[in-house]
Amino acid sequence: MAPPLHGESRAASWWRILGACLLAAVFLLAASSDACVLPPPFEAMEPINPKPYYEIGEKVEYRCKKGYLRQPFYLMVATCEKNHSWVPITDDGCIKKQCTYLNPPPKGRVEYINGTRTWGDIVHFSCVEGFYVSGIAALSCELRGDNVDWNGRVPTCEKVLCSPPPKIQNGKYTFSDVQVFEYFEAVTYSCDAVQGPDKLSLVGNEVLYCAGHQKWSSAAPECKVVKCPLPVVKNGKQISGLGQTFFYQATVTFQCLPGFYFNGSSTVVCGSDNTWKPSIPECLKGPKPTHPTKPPVYNYPGYPNPREGIFDQELNLWIIILLILIAVVGLALILLCACRFFERKKKSPEKVMPAIQISDHMVNAPILMPSTVQNPMKR
């Protein structure tokens, strides 16, 4: 692209300068001629026939914008005052138009997301359990010209139904003669009996139920031969699950011989891929390490989780020490307060001598010194 000519660039600069000068002139004219500039803008209303500036005392009338409804008893006129400002007004006199109220469909519910149904708001539909939404589940209130309306029709709630579940090779399911299953109706799969030493195992969920419209709870299982090899642990022995053939979900537990310890899990389960889960453990010679590396914990059917029901013994030691210190300090404060209370209780209040009333005839009586007082017993 060729660079712009110097003449074009200079012309554009002149137009910018001219626009700025005109804008400044408008403001200067308004200030010098005791006039107001453009009236304040509002979100819900706009001025009727606006002008560049208004003289003092001149009024501008507002009207509601498209999509807003005029409310009575609200001021819609602003006046240019002597200080070049406008009498403050608000656009509370114009409110958003509302779409019609939508009733929930039979067996359904309706929820207005913002609690209102003005244009821009959304309404959401849902159905009770056992039914599904047929149609648009969410509608929005839209502005169309000067009016508002929903962008679609209210959906319906239809009954959840399922077609028959998938058939499986070398297996079957119950209620195979039923063509339509209702919500939460279930079937149970099983494998056919076969000739030979190896039986068929049902791999997957045995029970399936109609969980949604044309949707079963899970994929159909399969019937196949699952056979894991004989589990052998050197320097160890089996203590449960003894046998010569190990089919799907067979569980075996091992024990190391004296002087050996486990490296791995002591319990394994025959998985659907003909391997043991987790892998076969080892029995290593020597004392068990104080802090051995923890093997990963697997949760397979029939395999217990060693953490279930066990309190976490790895409690932080510093937290325990802190709790003990807090308890000791609290006990010391209690004892100190008790001692001070008993000390104050033991102290008796100072005895106050009773006031002696002096009569008028005693005021002029002579004062006897201790040496002149006679013992009445010596008389």
Swiss-Prot record:
Domain Sushi residues, every copy: 36-96, 97-159, 160-225, 226-285
Entry's Gene Ontology cellular component terms: cell surface; membrane
Extracellular compartment segments: 36-316
Residue spans, topological domain Cytoplasmic: 338-379
Recorded superkingdom: Eukaryota
Signal peptide: 1-35
Disulfide-bond pairs as recorded: C36-C80, C64-C94, C99-C141, C127-C157, C162-C210, C191-C223, C228-C270, C256-C283
Keyword check for Glycoprotein: yes
Localization in the cell: Membrane
UniProt keyword terms in alphabetical order: Disulfide bond, Fertilization, Glycoprotein, Membrane, Repeat, Signal, Sushi, Transmembrane, Transmembrane helix
Transmembrane segment boundaries: 317-337
Membrane topology: Single-pass type I membrane protein
Main location: membrane
Biological process according to GO: single fertilization
Residue positions the entry lists as glycosylated: N83, N114, N263, T290, T293
Tissues in which the UniProt entry reports expression: Preferentially expressed in testis.
Function: May be involved in the fusion of the spermatozoa with the oocyte during fertilization.
Subunit structure: Interacts with C3b. Interacts with C4b. Interacts with moesin/MSN.
The name this protein goes by in its record: Membrane cofactor protein
Organism, as annotated: Cavia porcellus (Guinea pig)
Phylogenetic lineage: Eukaryota, Metazoa, Chordata, Craniata, Vertebrata
